[in-house]
């Protein structure tokens, strides 16, 4: 996979990932960290 090919479809994939997938992953990891620590 070349950089130019990835750049053509990366923005519209990256926007929803950053928008709702990353916060969900961060919340899940924080929850697991807090639960395992308690």
UniProtKB/Swiss-Prot annotation:
Alphabetized UniProt keyword annotations: Membrane, Photosynthesis, Photosystem I, Thylakoid, Transmembrane, Transmembrane helix
Alphabetized InterPro entries for the sequence: PSI_PsaI, PSI_PsaI_sf
Signal sequence residues: none
GO cellular component, one term: plasma membrane-derived thylakoid membrane
Membrane topology: Single-pass membrane protein
Subcellular location: Cellular thylakoid membrane
A matching Pfam family: PSI_8
Keyword Transmembrane among UniProt keywords: yes
UniProt function note: May help in the organization of the PsaL subunit.
Family designation: Belongs to the PsaI family.
The protein, known as: Photosystem I reaction center subunit VIII
Origin species: Gloeothece citriformis (strain PCC 7424)
């Amino acid at each position: 996979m070349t950089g130019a090919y990835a750049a053509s479809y990366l923005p519209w994939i990256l926007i929803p990932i950053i928008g709702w997938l990353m916060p969900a992953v961060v919340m899940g990891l924080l929850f697991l960290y807090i639960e395992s620590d308690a």
